Amino acid sequence: MGQKVHPIGMRVGIIRDWDAKWYAEKEYADYLHEDLAIRKFVQKELADAAVSTIEIERAVNKVNVSLHTAKPGMVIGKGGANVDALRAKLNKLTGKQVHINIIEIKQPDLDAHLVGEGIARQLEQRVAFRRAQKQAIQRAMRAGAKGIKTQVSGRLNGADIARAEGYSEGTVPLHTLRADIDYAWEEADTTYGKLGVKVWIYRGEVLPARKNTKGGK
């Protein structure tokens, strides 16, 4: 069977940037585990705040965490109470000074993570898997997507044998490196077990900036 490479990992360094921006030698393993702990903690604390991407940058004894969210008001809280509480907890977790940046996602229907999360939550509320996928596809296309593909796999409708069923609209050129494709997978906990949700969204082409060579050529 043909396997698909991760669309984001394939484009890192070409049109996508890293989610963790730091360099370390001896401390690499410690920093990596710390990053995983930060991401896990933030996703648990802000499970209902539509947080998509968590970017982490490091300086000496300082950690900058950028949260991309569709609900910045929920993350900040009244008078900044929620974000202050989150910062204090992250300071305690890491033992370092943590600075939090909040970046609003203007079009959540073009964010694969949020679209997948929406489908998964609908499946948990017993919405038909075909309907959940088709509604998500319609919203994404209306929001300006050039193409979208979704897939739900597992014991669909409680069937004894697990299977995968997907829908797509428009084009999703997975092999084109300049294609801005957002990808995410989520899980839905249903009474029949877990269902996997995958979403690919093609948002148009991005031409990487030309690198200047010597002589100005």
From Swiss-Prot:
The record ties this protein, via SMART domains, to:
KH
What are the entry keywords? Ribonucleoprotein, Ribosomal protein, RNA-binding, rRNA-binding
Report which residue ranges the record marks as coiled coil.
Answer: none
| GO biological process annotation, one example | translation
Family matches, as Pfam families: KH_2 (PF07650), Ribosomal_S3_C (PF00189)
Question: Which GO terms label this protein's molecular function in UniProt?
Answer: mRNA binding; rRNA binding; structural constituent of ribosome
- Per the similarity annotation, which family is this? Belongs to the universal ribosomal protein uS3 family.
Q: Which NCBIfam families match?
A: rpsC_bact
User: In UniProt terms, what function does this protein have?
Assistant: Binds the lower part of the 30S subunit head. Binds mRNA in the 70S ribosome, positioning it for translation.
Its protein name is Small ribosomal subunit protein uS3
